[in-house]
Amino acid sequence: HKVKCAEARLDFSKFVKKINPDDLPGRHFDVLTSAFHRIAAGEPVRLIINIAPRRGKSERTSYLFPAWFVGRFPKKKVMAICNVKTLASDFGAKIRNLMETQEYQDVFPNVRLANDAKSKDKWRTNYKGEYFAGGVGSTVYGRGADLLILDDIHSERESTDGKMEPPSKEDYDAAWNWYQSILSRLHPNGSILVVMQRWSKHDLCGRLIDASRRTPGSHQWEVITLPALEEKQDIDGNIHYESTWPEYWSTKAMVQLRETMMAEPGGAWRWNSMYQQNPGADSVSMMKRDYWRKWEKSSPPKCEFVI
């Protein structure tokens, strides 16, 4: 028992198994774990993880990882932001409640909540570390962060409600402007972790990536993309698709969802952005692989255009 607790203290994946023995495996969880370990090692990470919905990302990013991080570093400060404050506060409550369980205290026996600061959106450890939960637009003046977590800071309503075309740049100006204001809250050598599904080339991730490309001297963002379906090619050159989390979502189920979404107005950009993390393919007028044809003869028929 003591050995397993010691392992969970140092290894996030073993901590998850300790807290949730029925947790499903998944390749994308290995990617998240690797990123979390880099942050725990003190690397000042600027990391974007774009991942399809319903993949357990928030459970790990906004709940289990902060709980583990606070246990490892009870003097540090964590700031967690979602599109609305209530979501981040709910995660704060879950972490707070987890910290008072025997399972958690077996792993981190010396870490406790401070008696005078236990609200779900603002609490402290007995080592004066802090957790603060907020939403886009929340006031963060006077607060600092060693770890800033941005989890799905764009709401589905603002991105898709009634829209047949991809959202415009203006739809995301408020979130972008607010993000600029919280950068001053980050401590030296602090890390920023942005985990979200893509919505548009103008969303926060799109702008961060674009800013990095235009200004090489600025912080360069590492981007990890985890789509719902992964394109595979067999030895004969035939294309097929496989679910990236077959333990939970079968390939058949994801293909059916894709076809259902594609059949609806605006479904193409929704699928390509939200599920495939490819907002560059968010227009239904873009060429698709199905449009291409092969000719066995050495010269093709007469063409209107040659690319």
Name what the model sees in each region.
Residues 160-234:
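ASCE P-loop NTPase helicase motor core
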Residues 77, 81-140:
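Conserved nucleotide-state-sensing and coupling region of NTP-binding domains
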Residues 46-48, 77-79, 130, 147, ...:
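Residue-level preference for the first positions of well-ordered beta-strands
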Residues 1-45, 302:
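N-terminal accessory segments
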Residues 233-307:
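ATPase catalytic-site recognition across NTP-hydrolyzing enzymes
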Residues 121-178:
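Conserved RecA-like ASCE ATPase "motif II neighborhood" in helicase/translocase motors
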Residues 44-64:
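Walker A/P-loop
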Residues 61-73:
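Walker A/P-loop NTP-binding motif
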